[in-house]
Amino acid sequence: MAAPSPSSPPNLLSPPPFRSPEASYFLRTCSNFSQLKQIHTKIIKHNLTNDQLLVRQLISVSSSFGETQYASLVFNQLQSPSTFTWNLMIRSLSVNHKPREALLLFILMMISHQSQFDKFTFPFVIKACLASSSIRLGTQVHGLAIKAGFFNDVFFQNTLMDLYFKCGKPDSGRKVFDKMPGRSIVSWTTMLYGLVSNSQLDSAEIVFNQMPMRNVVSWTAMITAYVKNRRPDEAFQLFRRMQVDDVKPNEFTIVNLLQASTQLGSLSMGRWVHDYAHKNGFVLDCFLGTALIDMYSKCGSLQDARKVFDVMQGKSLATWNSMITSLGVHGCGEEALSLFEEMEEEASVEPDAITFVGVLSACANTGNVKDGLRYFTRMIQVYGISPIREHNACMIQLLEQALEVEKASNLVESMDSDPDFNSSFGNEYTDGMNETNETPSQHQIMFTKWDTGRF
């Protein structure tokens, strides 16, 4: 009897098998959209497109890259999506700033009768209603959730409250809160924030004092309410209660306390808050740093404001704007303009309309007519920023301060090209002349040479 032939050795050069676990792993570790498409191609090649888990991963990962159109293509290939997959697609569209598409998909889900709603469907849809300001549809979804038996879900109720408060329906928000059989800390905080945002401070105080448990978000919401309503003393009193309860503040708490210090006009209190933040390990980031600059400037310590600015590692546009404006307000016009040039050239930060309010204010406060006209033109021609009332007011102040009107007129004539200016500037200026019964001759010469239609 012949001996059996030995089995052939495995091919060590053959690629490893590509099954669902491998595909799932590659999707979890995918780092860009190009990789995702390659993985999807392999999924199709190996006939894995009916794997619901892989399809959901494809939708989730493509949405995380902002590729909702690709996610929709994947979703549309499914014959009978599960409720989970419908929910995922609705959520993906909503979080990627396409709420109307999310709502259309929800309507399609309703009329298709292929899938049943669950308790996660309605919160996602309500968030899409909020993002698109569709309060009418939100009310209809509210009724549909009641009929479907999901109204008592706390997550849904919290989302619904948020919708009503943010869409200016505080009474409806309170009704939802009052009907809740059980309330989480999120429920109480949503209610508190809703009342604060709708300027119902007295009601917010009652809710805050009734809360069975308070976290840093709750305390900060109430402190914010006092600051927003210009009641800084009560903001600090509440912060002391917060310390007694041993609740550590967050960055938003600190920034609100800095604003309260500004409202009090108390440099010493502002310094105390700054020192507290430093001792408790708060990082001097753009948010906190800008608030400190604003506080120090408005409380009269430009030197401290500049110190904070100089030690900041990262600076946002708001940070630059705050420092430039502070310098201009305090009469340091040349330093403000120098800082603006530094922002453009070294920091590569593009200015906005607020930046030029600070720049033009600096020119106006120091009577710098030449640079004022130059920056005004540059704002329009280089950055395409249309003049707003504050810009016009600065230019009126600047030209009124000019001792040599003819010289200012010559500067106007020396502009290289015709900017598309807002006509309100010339009108406001000449109207101001008429109100003061000032002799219009020289001023009118200036605006005749630089046609007021160009403003």
Curated annotation (Swiss-Prot):
PPR repeats lie at residues 51-81, 82-117, 118-152, 153-187, 188-214, 215-249, 250-284, 285-315, 316-350, 352-387, 388-418. Residues 1-19 form a transit peptide. It is found in: Plastid, Chloroplast. It holds the Pfam family PPR. Keywords: Chloroplast, Plastid, Repeat, Transit peptide. Its main location: plastid. GO terms for biological process: RNA modification. The keyword Chloroplast applies. The keyword Repeat applies. GO terms for molecular function: mRNA binding. One of its GO terms (cellular component) is chloroplast. Belongs to the PPR family. PCMP-A subfamily. This is Pentatricopeptide repeat-containing protein At3g26630, chloroplastic. The lineage of its organism: Eukaryota, Viridiplantae, Streptophyta, Embryophyta, Tracheophyta.
